[in-house]
């Protein structure tokens, strides 16, 4: 059933937006420069910084700490128009809640990265190493997939004894080839131009999403039909990224031994939507509790 749905969505989008695919099929990336070390890091929290949950604030602080030469640009509902313009039909559907904030943010990241370049990072990324994607025109987090009992498994390079189900199985459009929550590239890049155009076109024609991961489906469609887009994605090296492992161990008691295996990993994708315990059963801080009290791992 998953395979049929996956293929049906791609087939529908391909038929509906074949003109866009054709338009971009001859795009080249030869003129694209490498990611500018002074380009912005884009962070969005729609409700504003003051309304971030505490764990998100910790993640945001670590991003700023490791931003290096990249200026950090904070985007919220109150200021996004300063940086990005959208067609009236998009704004109207956002105001009517036809387009959710989550799906609007997908268009926002494509818009910002196309207009300015830089790095889009979800506000829930705990960052432990300096951010630098020099010497490449495009970057995203990707992992080698190891199939295990039908589930795609991502294993850390250099870290033994850790394995966790990768959140995209083999029928997902991303299949570990990219991560929408961390994308980086150059101003005017064809990949972001395409993403913006097809998402605008989709929401002009529709009042609901064909699937929650519509964003990944549009990237998959481009990957399959636009050679230069495929090249950009394929040229990104596999990252050290058991990116969800820390999240599922937040209630583990904090100790240097228990966190040592996470420290070599630059990015950990966390969530504010789950309830974690600040203290273990013996009263000692959990990893979650340590993060809140020390603002870092």
Placement of each model-derived feature along the sequence:
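Small-residue hinge/turn detector
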Residues: 106-116
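Active-site acidic Asp-centered loop
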Residues: 116, 121-123
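Glycosyltransferase-associated regions of secretory-pathway enzymes
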Residues: 1-105, 123-297
